[in-house]
Amino acid sequence: MSQDRRNDYDVTNTVQVSNPVAVRNAVNALFSETFPGTSFDKLWLAFYDFERLFTGRYPGYKGCDTTYHDLQHTLDMTLALARLVAGYERSVEPPDRLGAARAQMAIITSLFHDSGYIRHETRDRDFTNGAEFTLYHVSRSADFLRRYLPELGLARDVGVASMIVHFTGYELDLDHIELDDPRDIICGHLIGTADMIAQMADRCYLEKLSLIHI
């Protein structure tokens, strides 16, 4: 294998983070190892719908047209989140572990954390580019999760997912986010950390900085 880091590969140079199937398989391996015997079906569907959303094949949506917050960034971030979750589960006592259901929710939230940049065909017809939503895109992502999770059979996760997605932005003061279970707050911090790690570990991070708001 070449010693040079490839532009669209993760920090280990082993997973092509521009390829949804490659990232899905890597996340599946981590999830199955961390939570043996747990179904990956809903996560498989979430990856499928994520790819459709960002490529313009999800009903009612135009696809991703922002230069920086694209499919590759989200896949890179979701892989980082899955690795953080796996490491966290190994490092804490059993009562403090997130568990499979909460980990699943965190991964799905990661997949759609930038869905607020995607324009809807009718609701957003007055906008010409997803970058116009930058200042409030996380709230739009939360709205997308509120609509999407029940379709996936995960209505129970709506309340938490629509809050912890805000750990990827600045629209809410994180110190003021209150959730009943501290493990949900941990998920939020892991998601926010994964978002930052994925950005800074990107092989082309410096080159992409000028594109971050377009």
Which stretches of residues belong to each language-model region?
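Conserved small/polar residues in nucleotide/adenosyl-binding loops
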Residues: 212-214
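Active-site alpha-helical segments that house and flank conserved acidic catalytic motifs
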Residues: 102-116, 188-199
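Non-catalytic interface/linker regions that flank or bridge core catalytic/transmembrane domains
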Residues: 1-64
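Histidine/acidic-rich helix-loop-helix segments that form or flank divalent-metal centers
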Residues: 149-210
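Alpha-helical phosphate/pyrophosphate-handling elements in metalloenzyme active cores
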Residues: 62-105
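An active-site-proximal "capping" alpha-helix that borders the catalytic cofactor pocket
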Residues: 77, 84, 134-151
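Active-site metal-coordination segments of metallo-dependent hydrolases
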Residues: 66-76, 128-140
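His-Asp-centered metal-binding catalytic motifs of divalent-metal-dependent phosphohydrolases/nucleases
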Residues: 77, 104-125, 141, 162-171
